[in-house]
């Protein structure tokens, strides 16, 4: 069984293409759309996430704008929990907390509704790719600001050379694929 899973993960990894100089020169963008565009690979991603998190006491899933939303809905449905959108500034209609940070693309602001998390709720954050870790770290800090207990940050892929995992310390993180 381990060999079959390992083989499937290698095929999944091959489905993620690298786009040079997107969205700006010098960035090697990991495009997940070929992987999520095929049912067998999208199902594999969700199956791996579900297996990892189904026995953990997660109350809600926080999804990072925008590709974190791709996994959050299906995963939340499978786990029977709600979703919290963590969005760019100006996208959430109610009272928000906001934090400024530097991304690989420039200055950014992430927001979360102030009432999205009850004190002590166990939160899983999901996103597509862990690159520098700055966006994910900001999302984790927003969860904490709301009073949530961050269980883990889960990613489809991690760009190990950018050392995002180091920037996330001490927050626990998991990635299905490493590049």
From Swiss-Prot:
It catalyses: AMP + diphosphate = 5-phospho-alpha-D-ribose 1-diphosphate + adenine. Its EC number is 2.4.2.7. Keywords: Cytoplasm, Glycosyltransferase, Purine salvage, Transferase. Pfam families: Pribosyltran. SUPFAM superfamilies: PRTase-like (SSF53271). GO terms for biological process: adenine salvage; AMP salvage; purine ribonucleoside salvage. The keyword RNA-binding does not apply. It is found in: Cytoplasm. GO terms for cellular component: cytoplasm. GO terms for molecular function: adenine binding; adenine phosphoribosyltransferase activity; AMP binding. Coiled coil: none annotated. Its main location: cytoplasm. Pathway: Purine metabolism; AMP biosynthesis via salvage pathway; AMP from adenine: step 1/1. Belongs to the purine/pyrimidine phosphoribosyltransferase family. Homodimer. PANTHER family: ADENINE PHOSPHORIBOSYLTRANSFERASE (PTHR32315:SF3). Catalyzes a salvage reaction resulting in the formation of AMP, that is energically less costly than de novo synthesis. HAMAP family: Aden_phosphoribosyltr. This is Adenine phosphoribosyltransferase. The gene is apt.
């Amino acid at each position: 069984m381990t060999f079959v899973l390992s083989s499937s993960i290698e095929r999944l990894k091959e489905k993620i293409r690298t786009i040079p100089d997107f969205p700006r020169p010098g960035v090697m963008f990991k495009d997940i759309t070929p992987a999520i565009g095929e049912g067998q690979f999208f199902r594999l991603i969700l199956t791996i996430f579900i297996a990892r998190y189904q026995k953990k006491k997660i109350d809600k899933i926080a999804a990072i704008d925008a590709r974190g939303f791709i996994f959050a809905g299906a995963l939340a449905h499978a786990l029977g929990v709600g979703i919290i959108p963590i969005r760019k500034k100006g996208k959430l209609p109610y009272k928000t907390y906001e934090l400024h940070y530097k991304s690989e693309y420039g200055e950014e602001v992430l927001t979360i509704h102030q009432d999205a998390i009850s004190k002590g709720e166990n939160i899983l954050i999901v996103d597509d790719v862990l690159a520098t870790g700055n966006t994910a770290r900001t999302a984790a800090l927003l969860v904490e600001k709301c009073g949530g207990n961050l269980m883990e940050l889960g990613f489809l892929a991690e760009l190990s050379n950018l050392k995002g995992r180091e920037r996330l310390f001490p927050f626990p993180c998991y990635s299905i694929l490493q590049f």
